[in-house]
Each structure stands twice: as C-alpha cells, then as structure tokens.
Amino acid sequence: MGKKNTLKNFWVRLESASSTVTGSLIYLKPNFPNGKKEPELVFDCGTFLDSENKKYNEDFPCKPANIYAVFITHEHVDHMGRLAGFYNQGYKGKVFASEYAVQVIKSEAIKNFFFTMKNNEEPKHEEKDAISLINGCVPIKIGEIINIDDNVEMVAYNNAHTKGAVMYLITFKYEEHKIRILITGDYKKRSILGKSYFPSSKKYKGKITIVTEATNGTKKKPVAHFKKDLEKSLYEGKSILCSSAGSERYEDILYAIKTMQEAGKISSDIPIYLEVKNAFDLSKLNLNVLPFNFNLVNNSNVRKIALYDKRQKIIVVANYGAFTYYFPNVISKSNWGIFFVNHMYKGSLAERLMTPRGTIIKYCGKEYKKEATAYHTEEFSAHYYIDEFKELIEGFLDINAVFLGHGESESKKELQEEAQKRNGLNVQILKRGEAFKIFEDKIRHSS
C-alpha cells in the first residue's frame, strides 16, 4: 500500500507555451511524495513569429522567478528568442546550451536589443536583461550528466537537426522509481552534420515519455529535384537567389553545389556568394562543404558586388534580413531563378510565388510584378519525415506516452492518428494552456 501511495504522488507536470510551429517552450514542474520542493525547469524559450500568436511573446506558462534553469535545444529564434524577455520578467538562473548555441545566443542578445531600438519598436526587454542573458549562458558537453539535485539529472545528446542542436533526457528519481522524459526539440535522424544519438544501435529499455515535434506531420521524404532544377535554371542563363533562411541548413545547399561542380554540372567560373547571419558560422565543418569560387558576403560593399556583378552567379542567403535586401532587386527580372528550401506554409512567400509570371506579389508593404522563376523543395528539411519518426519510436522498448508539439494543428493530428493506429501508442497533442501530469507508467490531463 505504501508503494502505491508513493507512486500516486510522484509525477511531473508538463505544459507547453505553444500550439503552433513557433514559440517553443516546455515547462516541467516535478512533484515528489515527500513534499520536497524540487527545481522547476524550462526547455527552450522561443519567439512566436506568426502574426496570430505574436501577442503571446510576453506571456509564459510559469513564473520566470521560480525557474531553476533553462535548457535550450538549439539556436533558432523560435526556440531561444525570448530568453532576454524571460530575464526581464524575473528569471535569475542560468541558460544551458551547446557551445555553438551559446555563441549565437550571446551574439543575438545585444544585437536584437539595439535593432529594436533603432527601428523605434517597443522593446520586450531592457539592455540589462540582454547583459544578464550573456552572462547567464553556460555551455554543456554532449553525454555529460548534469546533476540538477539529488533527485533530478539531465544528459544532452547529439541532434542532427542543425549545428549545435541537442536533445535532453531528464530523469526524476524517487527511491527506486524513475520518470524519464526525452525532449528532442526539432529532430532529424541524420544530416550532413552527423547522426542523432537516438535511435541508438541498441534499443532503449527504460520506461520513457517522449516530447517531440510534428512539423512535417505524416509527409514522406520528398523526391530530390534541387540539383535538376538548378542545372536547368543555370543552363537557361539565369542567376540564382537561394533562400535557406529558417531551419534549413545552408551547408546542404553549398554541398549540393560543390558536388555539381565536381560532376561538371556547374562551371567553376560561376561565383558562389554566401551571406550568413554570424561570422563564426564558418567552422571547420562548413569549410569542408564550400564550393569552388566561393565568396563570403560579410559587409555592405560585398553585398552590393554580389547583387550587381553582371556575371551569372549563385547567391545563397541564410537569414531573413539578407533575403529582404536581394529579393526586391530580382523578383521582377526574368533572368533570375529564386529557390526556396524552407517548409512552405499556407500564405507564405514561397507559396505565393508558385504562380505564373506577371503575377503581382505583395512583399514588405510593396507590390512587385513577378518575372523571375520560382522553385521550391523540401528535400533539405531539417525536420524529420514519417519514416524517421517511426525509426525514433521503434528505438524504445517501453514508451509511456508521446507528446507532439512544434507543428500546425493538422500536421499534429495526422501524426497522432498514424502513431496510435500503427504503434498503439498513447499520443497527445500539446496545446497552449493545457497541461499533463506524467507518472512513472501513465499520464493524465492536469488542471
């Protein structure tokens, strides 16, 4: 009887701040039978980017002052963009992330604050909050156990989603009982960056609850056609603007171009320009995938050269700010091809450009006549497709439940139904304002 009562009062409350693709934040609050106050934890603290949910950017499902630590899965703004605002509302703790993610977070903290002030926008935080964030960042090592206290430990594992991405396995312990929660963040099994730790070569035996994404829903991996489209466009004499802004990695694009050069599909005389967000993005790994005739756009003068160089060229941009500079200058020119490798949402610019030439396109408050040829592919998606989701799930022998976040409602619903039908899993959809209690061997809704 004593053991049953103990388990009844041993649970972890889980709540998501988001019902959509952006604004990722997972809040965990443990409850132990002995009544001991245990650390409240937050995983990711991302910005809402869509107009419908931007109003929630100052709202959190927890009191920041009560949070013991924040753990970031990767450096994309929809996973870390509200960190300074979290400090503004009372957070005093540390922010743990991979060494690379820490570099990006620090770089963005002050820059974003001054960008907001420069554009006369209402800041969501003060300069002191950005400074607190910079000094609060702590790099973590892959595979190293972090003992948060005697009852809670955490390990970060490699995640192939993007550079510096990790997934976290958190274990809450009480006597011989354990509640294990795996938070993947955005997930990719394998990429040019390497392979994710899970699924591993041996199936994981312990009872586990998985919190993961559902960006692509039940989509199968698309047929690769980027190289074919690029070769055709270049053969027609077009210059190329390729947007890898968002979660799609520019390394994949550059490596595809490099392999095409090596195969004689692209002349090495064609200059390749790359504009990235941070100078330190050019790591040793990046250098290994760089094509011939490569030029880094690292200041306004080189940017002008990239645009006005009359030779046929390829420009790859890895951030939205750079894209807003190039796009208005090429959209109305028939000798340009515009490639999108992002996930194409309804109403997105990529979707609106999949229209005939001569269509009027509205962008940043202005109208442009579309004459350039637009292409789209999701073959470089940094998010898993259905087969990778199945492989992830099959890597665990005893799954308590699966929670789906980071996706549109339809995508999450489709994946939920597929997983329940084929795997017999308890699959729940994370929604803003809803919470769950995770027990050792079950889950239930929480008020």
Question: Where in this protein do the model-derived segments appear?
Answer:
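Conserved acidic residues
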Residues: 68, 207-208, 313-314, 336, ...
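Redox- and metal-dependent alpha/beta enzyme cores, enriched for Fe-S-associated oxidoreductases
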Residues: 332-372
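Cap/insert and terminal regions of metallo-dependent hydrolase folds
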Residues: 190-274, 360-425
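His/Asp/Glu-rich metal-coordinating catalytic cores
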Residues: 2-71, 76-80, 85-252, 258-265
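A general structural motif
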Residues: 219-223, 295-306, 316-323, 356-359, ...
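Short acidic-hydrophobic, aromatic-tinged amphipathic segments that line or gate anion-handling sites
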Residues: 135-143, 294-302, 429-430
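Short, surface-exposed amphipathic charged segments that create phosphate/polyanion-binding patches used
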Residues: 148-157, 284-292, 389-392, 439-447
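Hard-cation-handling environments
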Residues: 227-349, 405
